[in-house]
């Protein structure tokens, strides 16, 4: 769902998304051949300003999200604003990703941490 005029969500070929909430205030790019499991949430903004008087009138700062090709995001994961997930990476189920993940890595946890390179 694009929450403001001009926001973009781009989803590549052969990407499968199951029961996931995607909110774009700016831009979210999801590559080709990705698997995004059920109950994931992908937000490029916190959805509101932290100042009490501006919560209903100001969406806060949006930061683009980029998910590369052939990424697998496990169920119940949350991808936060400004994150990039490199191609061929895996995000473990239930992770909260608040920092970028390089290509060909497995990350998991809350907050998500790099676990290992996929080829190790």
Residue ranges with predicted function:
Residues 112-114:
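Multi-pass alpha-helical transporter architecture, strongest
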Residues 99, 116:
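Short helix N-cap motif at coil->helix boundaries in the Bergerat
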Residues 38, 93-94:
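Active-site-proximal glycine-rich helix-loop-beta segment
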Residues 84-86, 101:
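Extended beta-solenoid/beta-helix repeat architectures
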Residues 1-79, 83, 117-119:
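Flexible, glycine/small-residue-enriched loop-and-beta-strand segment within the central core
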């Amino acid at each position: 769902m694009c929450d403001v005029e001009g926001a973009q969500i781009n989803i590549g070929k052969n990407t499968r998304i199951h029961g996931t909430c995607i909110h774009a205030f700016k831009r979210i790019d999801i590559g080709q051949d990705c698997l995004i499991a059920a109950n994931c949430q992908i937000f490029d903004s916190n959805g509101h300003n932290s100042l009490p008087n501006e919560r209903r009138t100001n969406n806060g700062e949006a930061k683009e999200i980029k998910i590369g090709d052939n990424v697998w995001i496990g169920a119940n994961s949350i991808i936060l604003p400004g994150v990039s997930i490199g191609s061929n990476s895996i995000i473990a189920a239930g992770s909260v990703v608040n920092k970028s993940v390089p290509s060909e890595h497995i990350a998991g946890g809350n907050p998500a941490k790099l676990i290992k390179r996929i080829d190790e």
